[in-house]
Amino acid sequence: MADDIIKVNQWGKVTKLNAGGGLIMPFVQELFLLECEIAGTGFVKNMEEKAKALTAGSVVSLVREPDNKYDDLAIRIDNSDGEKLGYVPRKQNEVLARLLDGGKMLYGKVAEVEFAEYSSWVTITTKIYMKDL
């Protein structure tokens, strides 16, 4: 590590050059974008069971649904087994949809899972991140 050289390239991207081999290794950054409550959990079958399997820090996937009949900017949120948990709320999905459409890697981490005391209602709060190279 002491032989590494830190450089800024012509696009302003910081890279690390290994003086021994000259290999370019980007700094991988996890960029926090927003926090939201997953929408539509009340319409997901077996939601309570799926929610019980989640803990703070559980990673969730963001999947674009450009052909969604209710919202052409829809972003589905799936658990680690690929099962639907719900959606990014419509009022927060436009920029995220554009990033996903542009090939950016977005994902979420569960921040909190709350179960209603007298019903089967579940509130899942997730933090959305972009992995930037």
Predicted segment positions?
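Conserved active-site motif detector
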Residues: 1-133
